[in-house]
Amino acid sequence: MKHTPCVPKRRCRMLLAAAVMAALLSPAASPRAEAAAFDAHYTSASLSVQEQEAGNLLNSDRGRYNLPALTIDPELSRIARIKSQDMLAGGYFSHTSPTYGSVRDMLTRFGYPYSAASENIARHSTLEKAQAALISSPGHRRNVLSTTFTKVGIGVATTPEGYVYVTQIFCR
């Protein structure tokens, strides 16, 4: 007899997100354990297809201004992915996470060394529209086109309806 789960996929995702958030909020959770919980679908050295595409869109915008491509850092992308997943699971859209604080707080918490850092976040129906919105906003555009940063982390989370949460963390 074939087992068919009676719980819809959306409910499973919500239960998984709630379980991950509960584990992350426990006092015993270490930064590495937190990252591992959100990294279930990827190794720390890999990017999803959407994250690769988002990185290509960002570097394409830089190329239009004759700027060098930023190096897409896997560890920084892991942190950016955690931020996107946190916004999706937590139902918020802000540069300040109720769980992790600011981008600098997150980098410190996860032990990522940096001398300069900034963050872009976008929520849209497609990656292309998210990047277009970022490049159209003066503050976000400044980050995308900055010569201060040499590395970027890209994190993407997708809602059941197909909307994307994109986090770009820029560092030097």
Question: What is the meaning of each model-derived region?
Answer:
Residues S46-D105, V152:
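Short, well-ordered surface patches within globular domains
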Residues C6-V7, A19, A35, H41:
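Generic early N-terminus positional signal peaking at residue ~5-7
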Residues A29-A35:
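Sec/Tat signal peptide C-region and signal peptidase I cleavage site
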Residues A36-S44, G63-R64:
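Short, contiguous pre-domain boundary segments
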Residues A17-P27:
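Bacterial N-terminal signal peptides
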Residues K2-C6, S102-R172:
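A well-ordered secondary-structure block
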Residues T4-L16:
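Bacterial N-terminal signal peptides that target proteins for export
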